Regions:
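Two-component/phosphorelay signaling modules centered on CheY-like receiver
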Residues: 10-29
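Alpha4 helix (beta4-alpha4-beta5 surface) of REC/receiver domains from two-component response regulators
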Residues: 17-18, 62, 85-100
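Helix N-cap/capping motif at the beta->alpha junctions
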Residues: 30-39, 60
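Short amphipathic alpha-helix used as the core "switch/output" element in two-component signaling
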Residues: 39, 61-74
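Active-site beta3 strand of CheY-like receiver
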Residues: 44-50
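Receiver (REC) domain active-site loop signature in two-component systems and cognate sites
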Residues: 55
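C-terminal output helix
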Residues: 106-115
Length: 125
């Protein structure tokens, strides 16, 4: 499985990649914002996207909107990992089509649980 991790904070990208590796996901790539990530997604065959919300250039919610508007990417599973904990933002992400939402800080167990739930829902669909 090919996973793209998008966050403007390199330490957070590294933390997420290490947690994913510990969960058995070793084919991971990084981008530092949505502007960098979108062409990578459009040109590569990614199976999963993990993105932050607050980033310069293109925010995670704008990246999510672009992914859902692209016929080739519309079904890409997206997990948002963010400090944004306001109810309105969680609702907006859900309405925009996010598959899962994790609020920072989080544990490996939380990340694993969210990823597994996303794949359970996809398998049932």
């Amino acid at each position: 499985m090919k996973i793209l991790v998008v966050d403007d904070f390199s330490t957070m990208r590294r933390i997420v990649r290490n947690l994913l590796r510990d969960l058995g996901f070793t084919n991971t790539f990084e981008a530092d914002d949505g502007k960098t990530a979108l062409p990578m997604l459009q040109g590569g065959s990614y199976d999963f996207l993990v993105t932050d919300w607050n980033m310069p250039g293109m925010t995670g919610i704008d990246l999510l909107k672009a992914v859902r508007a692209d016929p080739k990417l519309v079904n890409l599973p997206v997990l948002m990992v963010t400090a944004e904990a306001k109810r309105e933002q969680i609702i907006l992400a859900a309405q925009t089509g996010v598959n899962g939402y994790v609020i920072k800080p989080f544990t490996a167990a939380t990340l694993k649980e969210k990823i597994e739930k996303i794949f359970e829902r996809i398998d049932k669909a």
